[in-house]
Amino acid sequence: GINKQNNVNGNVEYIALQFPIHKRLAMSVGLLPYSYVGYSFGAQRTNEANLNYVETYNGSGGLNDLYVGLSIDVWKKRLSVGANFGYFFGNIKHEQYSIVGTGNTYNANRSQNLEVRDLKMDFGVQYTHPISKTEEVTLGLTFSPKKRLHSTYTNTSVKYTDNGASEVISSDTLKNQAYDIPNSFGFGASYVKKDKLTLAADVLYETWGKAHFYSSDNNFKNRVRVAAGGEFIPNAQNRNFFSRVRYRAGAHYSNSYLMINN
């Protein structure tokens, strides 16, 4: 008997629009990815009956943030504050397959599906200080408060026989389950010399160590992400193509919020 299963997944990278609605008020709307799951690995094992089988683990899906943002110029186009009002949605699926390579045994599939639908908010403040007519420095702070998202969690186990029949061993659907996204604190700074040089860096700190995921309270640790980048234009006014090319480089580092037991 041959068992075959196909999965097709799609994902939108991002959509974002910004536009002024008043001389001191601007709006932004967009669809941004918040998290992404994508993995596949397996191993050959031996069960209690001394039969060899292949165990495969797959993960797919992600969470997206559909948001509307507002920002207000508080002081002389230098100091501004803003907030995003977002709708969180998405599905995350984890699957485990056990495939036995004999004609009188069965294959098994266990899947866990998380479906999230909820609201969230983010806040920010930004200050720009001009150094000269062509240079400025910008500093920014962001804060996203901890949010307990309401979600639906489905855990299903299915057995497949060689003749193509399937039997649901167990299926549990838990609605209005608790799934946390943590407090998030961000700081960024940039230096811009008009038509010449841009340097920027930011730091993000997330308190995953206090996050809750259903019955698990101790599987996460706090996460730090550091990123830096720059852009250089040799001569923006020169007619030579390579003099007007924007040369960019960047790097980032982050630790995982997952706590792996040794």
Regions found by a protein language model. Give the residues of each.
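Subset of outer-membrane beta-barrel
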Residues: 1-262
